[in-house]
Design a protein with these regions (language model features):
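MFS transmembrane alpha-helix packing/gate-lining sites
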Residues: 62-66, 153, 157, 300-308
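Primarily marks hydrophobic transmembrane alpha-helices of the MFS/SLC 12-helix fold
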Residues: 83-89, 325
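Helix-to-loop junctions at the C-terminal end of transmembrane segments
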Residues: 65-82, 307-321
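C-terminal ends and interior cores of transmembrane alpha-helices
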Residues: 87-108
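Loop-to-transmembrane helix entry
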Residues: 48-60, 148, 184-185, 278-303
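Intracellular loop-helix junctions on the cytosolic face of multi-pass helical membrane proteins
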Residues: 1-15, 107-114, 123-126, 130, ...
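Helix-loop boundary and gating motifs at the non-cytosolic
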Residues: 6-62, 248-253, 257-282
Length: 325
């Protein structure tokens, strides 16, 4: 079972909630640059468009494995100085920053695919504890508000990061390069993203405290009892089997939603650059300007998603929803 944390939680101010959620800005910078421009990097390195989904496959497989493991481990972590979730924030941010910075410098497809794999794994290490932090820190009456603040930060991060290559081009950074070389506009965008990712997560680490377990001695006993790989594996399987019905229903919805997400992220750049802009030469001005535009379109999608999420959160808080199926 999951060790209990302190239940007497104080109501937090807007800025306290903002501080604890601010790291999501960097996480979303990483996800937006990954989702909007990794296919562009793959194509620049010579990938055929039909092979792009295979190059992407590491990302969802990594998330499938990393998320339950990180969730299990972070639930059973406590250090008087470093807290419960913050060690995962830090190490995930460190690895993500390195992978994000070096991804556009890949000289071969296997290097770019490896960078994507490391980037996705590292972002998941930071992201999952961030979601759990809302439940850790906020009383029940403020949890919805906490997720709304996270949604706001996610939308801002998606829009800004997705427009970075376009902005770099506008201020004069070269947007084309020789065959097999990623343009400087993309390299600069990923470097800025790496800086924002690490600094925003570090800001949350430095400005946010965590509640200790209700009973530290009991917490340590529980952790010792479930020590080891096999115990952890059994606990994860047990948690999945005992998942509430509503979560299982949500899982089905998410399962089908990700068909669309994965198709969009992997194929948006090759499809739009070729069929809308008529550009297939990755060294041409036309292709790279079109690829910048694809990123901007995905940024707009993120911004619109944010507004709809805020509207739905408001509606859900005002209207009693019948959840019978």
């Amino acid at each position: 079972s999951q060790p209990k944390m302190t239940e007497n939680k104080q109501r937090l101010s807007f800025w306290q909630i903002w501080n604890m959620s601010f790291g999501f800005l960097g996480i979303q910078f990483g996800f937006a640059l990954q989702g909007g421009f990794m296919s562009r990097i793959f194509q620049t390195l010579g990938a055929d468009k039909d092979a792009i989904p295979l190059l992407w496959i590491a990302a969802p497989l990594t998330g499938l494995l990393i998320q339950p493991i990180v969730g299990y481990l972070s639930d059973r972590t406590w250090h008087p100085k470093f807290g419960r979730r913050k060690p995962f924030f830090f190490f995930g941010a460190l690895l993500s920053t390195v992978a994000l910075f070096f991804a556009p410098y890949s000289s071969a497809l296997w290097m770019a695919a490896g960078a994507l794999w490391i980037l996705d794994a590292s972002i998941n290490i930071s992201m999952e504890p961030f979601r759990a932090l809302v439940a850790d820190k906020l009383p029940d009456s403020q949890r919805s508000y906490g997720f709304v603040v996270q949604t706001l930060i996610i939308g801002i991060g998606t829009w800004v990061a997705s427009n970075l290559p376009w902005l770099m081009t506008k201020i004069g950074v070269p947007n084309t390069a020789a065959e097999g070389i990623v343009p400087d506009s993309v390299k600069y965008a990923f470097a800025i993203g790496a800086f924002v990712l690490f600094s925003s997560i570090l800001y949350t680490i430095l400005t946010t405290d965590e509640y200790p377990p209700e009973n530290v001695e009991e917490f340590e006993k529980e952790k010792a009892k479930n020590k080891g790989f096999f115990s952890g594996f059994v606990e994860i399987i047990k948690s999945i089997s005992e998942m509430p019905t509503v979560m299982k229903q949500l899982g089905v919805v998410q399962f089908f939603s990700w068909f669309a997400f994965f198709t969009m992220w992997s194929f948006a750049t090759p499809a739009i650059t070729e069929h809308i802009f008529g550009a297939t030469d990755t060294t041409s001005v036309e292709y790279n300007n079109a690829a910048d535009s694809v990123g901007s379109y995905l940024g707009t999608y993120g911004l619109v998603s944010m507004f709809y999420a805020l509207i739905l959160a408001f509606v859900a808080s005002k209207i009693k929803i019948n959840r019978k199926f």
